[in-house]
Amino acid sequence: MNESLNNSSRLAVLCSICLAICFFFYKFGFRILDPTNIGFIFRMGGDLATSYFGWAFLRESPWSFPFGKLTGYFSPIGSYSTIVGANPLLTIPLKLLSPLLPSDFQYFGWSLLACYCLQAYFGYRLMRLITSNIIQQVLGVGFFLLSPPFLWRITQGHEGPSAQWIILAAFTIYFENYSSIKNKNVILFWSLLIVGAFAIFTYFCAMVMAFAIAFSLGHVVFTPHYRLKLIGSVALYPLLVLATFASLGFLSSGISYQWDLLSYTTYSLNLNSFINPLRWSWILPGLPYRLGQMEGFNYLGLGIIILVGCSIIYLVWQRPKFNNLKYLAPFLITLLLFFIYAISNRVTWGNVVLFRYPLPEPVLRMANILRCSGRFGYPLFYAILYGALFCFVAIRRKTLSIVLMCTCLLIQIADIHKLLYDPVFHEAGPVVSPLKSAAWQSIGRNFDKIIIDPPFISAITDEDDYKYFLLYAYKNHLAIDTGFPGRLPLKRMQIYKDELQESLGSGKLDPKAIYLFADPIDAETLKIFHKWDQCALVDGYIVYTTDGRFLDGSNSLEVEPLTFREFLKKYEGNTILIAAREYLASALLPEEVKKYLLEKGSKLPALGFAGSYVGVFSRGQKVVEKISAKRDVKVEMRGQVAPSGRQVIADQDIELYSAGVPFGNKASIKIAGVEHSRGRGGLNIVAIDRDGNILASIFFGVNNPNRTTLCYTSK
C-alpha cells in the first residue's frame, strides 16, 4: 500500500514538473537557457536588465562584508547586488566560479525555469493535502502554473516577483501542520524559507514571516506541547530578517525612501483587480484602474473565475461540514491584514476613489518601505484559488469533478493565452549596441570612469539606452554613475549631483573620465558649461574629455537650444511626425504652442492624461492625426501619398504608433522600416524632408515640454 502510494506520488511530481517544463519552453523557447545569451535581457530591459548588471558588476567588485557590494555600478556611491535585484543565493556562489565563466554569462533563464518547476512542485504538495487522486492533483498544478500574476511577472523576466512558489511553500508548511505539528523541524523550515525569501524578494519575506508568526501564535493557543518553542520562534523570525538585512547590505546603503513621491497608495490593489484582465484576456474586456495599480495585477482568469463560482454554488448547495476551523483563523486574519495593506488608505474601484482615511506620517513612512502594496494581493489570489480547488476535489463524483476541472483549465488557457507565449524571448538575437565608433575602444583603454550629466538616468539619448553604457563599462572595467537600485540613497545622490554641477561650472574636470551629456542637454548645464565647442558627437552621443583626443575636426559639436514653438517654426516647411508616450498632459503645453496647433486644426491640445496620440504635419498643415484615451493609435502612410490622397509627404513609407500607459506605454516613428523615435516620455518628434531624410529627431519631455536642444556635427 505504501509502495503504491509512493509510486503514485512520484508519478504526480514527475507529471507536474513535466507540465511546468512544457509551459516554460512554450513561453520562452530554448535559447534562454544558453548562459551566454544576453540578447533577450537587452530586448526586455527594465528590471531584468537591472538584475543582470547587479550580477555583472558584482563579478568585477572585490569580496566584501556585507555581501554583494558593487563598486563600479552607480558610482561613486555604489550599491549592493541584492538591492539591484540580483539573487544572492545564486550570485554569491557563481562569483566564486567567475574566473571560469564567460564574460556574457547569465543565469536568468535557468532561474526562471526553476520558478516554473518550484511553482509546480509546491502546487502539487498543496493538492496532495486535499486529494489523493493523481489526475486532480496534476490538474490543480495546472491552475497554479496558469496563474496570471505569476505569468505576468515571469513575462517581465524579473526573477524576484516571479518566485511566487515561495507563497505556495508557505501555504504548504502551514497546511501540512494545520491542526497538529507533524514535523518537528517546522520552525527550521519557516526560518529557512524566511531567509531565502528575503534573499530573493523582500516582499515575499514579509509575507512568509507574517504567515510564520500567525502559525506560531495559532499553535501557541491550540498546541500547548510546543508552546515554549513557538513563543521563541515569534522572536526568532524578526531577528533572522534583521541579520539577513544587515549581511546583504541594506543597512550600509544609505537608503532614503521616496515616501512623499512614491507613496504606497500609488501602487495599491484596486478592488476590481481579481476580475480586471487589463489587456491580457481573450474574452473579458479590461477595466479601468488608477496609475500605478498594475503592481496589484491579480486577475484570476476566466477559468478560475468559473472555478470560484462553481465552488460557491457547491458550498451553498451541499453545505459541507469543516473540521478544525479554529486553526484556520490565524491564516484568515493574516490574509485580511494583507488585504487592508494592499488596498492602502486610498480605496479604489476602477479609476474612482471610493474613500480614503488619513494615516500618520510615521505610519506612511513605514508603509512605504514596501511601497508596492498591491503585491500583497498575491497571497489572496492563491488563497482564493486553493479554496476553490478544495471545494472542487470535495465533489463526491470524481468523474464530474475532473471533467469540470478540465473544462475550467481549458477556458483558462484560452482566456490568458497571450500570457503563455512571448515572442520577445524567442526572437531576441545578439545585443546590437549603438556604440559602434572606434573611439569607444580608446575610451576603454585610456579612461577609468564614465560620468553622465545628469547622473543616475536611464535615457541619455534614447529610451533605456543606459544599459548599453553599463555593458560597455562592465566589459571595459570602468566605473559609471548610472544604474537603478531598487532603493535610492537620495541624499548622497543629491550631494553628488551638486558636486558634478560645480565641477562643470568651474571647469575642474576629471582627466581620467569621459563625460556624456544627455540630449536634450540639462538646462542648468547648458548655462554653466562653456566648452560645447570642444565636445564631440560620437554615435549621436555628446562626448567631452579634458584632452580632446576624440576631436579630429570631423565630429566637433554645435548646440542649438530651441523652444517647442521655435522648433515648429524652424521645420514648418518640412514634414513633422509626432508620437506621444507616457503621462503627457496637454496642460503642460505652452499657450503659444496650443494656439499654433489649434490654428492647424490639431487635437493635440486635447490629449488627456496618459492618452495616445500620433500626428503628421507637412508644409505648415495638418495631414492626419489620431488621438484616444481608450486605446493605442496608429497611422501608416505607404508609398508617397498621404491618406488624403492629395499631398506627397516623402519618398518613404511612414509608420507612427502611440500607446498610452494603460495600453502599452510606447511611442514609435518608423521611416522605411527604421525606428527614429526617441521612445521617451513626452512628445517624440521627427522632422524629415521631401526625400525622407532625417532633419531632426528630438523629444519634448514630460517635465519640461517647452525646451530641447538640437545637436549637429559641424562641417
Where are these regions (language model features)?
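Membrane-embedded helix bundles of polyisoprenyl
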Residues: L113, C117-L126, Q136-Y178, N183-H219, ...
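Periplasmic/ER-lumenal interhelical loops and adjacent helix-loop junctions
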Residues: G45, L240, T244-Y314
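Perimembrane helix-loop-helix junctions
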Residues: N2-S4, Y174, A206-L239, S311-N323
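Extracytoplasmic
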Residues: I416-V559
